[in-house]
Amino acid sequence: MDSAAAAAAKRVQIEKAHNFMRQYRDPESRELKKLSANQFMDVWAHYDKDGNGYIEGTELDGFLREFVSSANATDISPEAVTDTMLEELKSCFMEAYDDNQDGKIDIRELAQLLPMEENFLLLFRFDNPLESSVEFMKIWREYDTDNSGYIEADELKNFLRDLLKEAKKINDVSEDKLIEYTDTMLQVFDANKDGRLQLSEMAKLLPVKENFLCRQVFKGATKLTKEDIEKVFSLYDRDNSGTIENEELKGFLKDLLELVKKDDYDAQDLAAFEETIMRGVGTDKHGKISRKELTMILLTLAKISPDDEE
């Protein structure tokens, strides 16, 4: 390496240590450069220091200080952003990007903030959440081709390929780039780092518009009406057969399981939960429930207070 290249490399190293975001800005215009999937993950990993899936607290303060100070042409340090400026900035920033208003930034919210390769951005499905968990379970069954109860790397790659094909972008994506996207999505969503996606991890990659069962009416706050129960039944009985079965039942149980297990459950948990629920309603019909049985389940759920769920 010649002396000029060595000096340039050292300068980048110093910039990284001083302000991680500065390397991603154009030195002339100070605009953010378009990030590759790998660069985006570098930014995420740098600021999500505890690896809990959120940029929050002091991590968020550090990100905002560096994000703002890196836009300045003069080499000011992040510390130049005063606490008062930081609070004002945080308030505006969170109003614009904290979609779920939880006071922290998750990976989807960061993806909306930073300029990224268009194809990679498409994979986050910002404008296209699934209608229901029934749809989710149909997709799960389609891509879990070996019925292992997990979406492995090759199955995830097939899913991402089809997602881009659906968006008519597949011709733009090479096999190498698809592998990069698959690896990146695993880094993002594979919380337990076992190299594959379990149900709860895939549910974060493929969000559902709303888990209807999370509404307060099902948590004992108000009396359940016949209309409430009918609404739930029609939500899951997608084929209007008069019973909730197959992926409809799996989707219903997934939504129920999310109330109990929160963010960490897999296909084995779902199967065990199904067995418990079916035994609880005393049904001998394997893999399907009627309106009456759904009513029993929802009435039981409504009796459980939020404190009991913890």
Curated annotation (Swiss-Prot):
Query: Could you tell me the keywords of this UniProt record?
Result: Calcium, Metal-binding, Repeat
User: What InterPro entries would the database entry show?
Assistant: Calbindin_Ca-bind, EF-hand-dom_pair, EF_Hand_1_Ca_BS, EF_hand_dom, EFh_CBN
Which amino acids does the record list as binding Ca(2+) 5?
237, 239, 241, 243, 248
Q: Which residues bind Ca(2+) 2?
A: 98, 100, 102, 104, 109
Q: Which residues does the annotation say bind Ca(2+) 1?
A: 48, 50, 52, 54, 59
**Which positions are annotated as binding Ca(2+) 4?**
190, 192, 194, 196, 201
**What tissues express this gene product?**
Expressed in a large number of neuron of the brain and the thoracic ganglion as well as in two small muscles of the thorax.
GO cellular component terms, alphabetically, are: cytosol; dendrite; nucleus; synapse; terminal bouton; type II terminal bouton; type III terminal bouton
- Tell me which residues make up the EF-hand domain: 35-70, 84-120, 131-166, 177-212, 224-259, 283-304
Name the CDD domains on file: EFh_HEF_CBN
MF GO annotations: calcium ion binding
Disulphide bond pairs: none
Q: Which residues bind Ca(2+) 3?
A: 144, 146, 148, 150, 155
Instruction: State the family it belongs to.
Output: Belongs to the calbindin family.
What name does this protein carry?
Answer: Calbindin-32
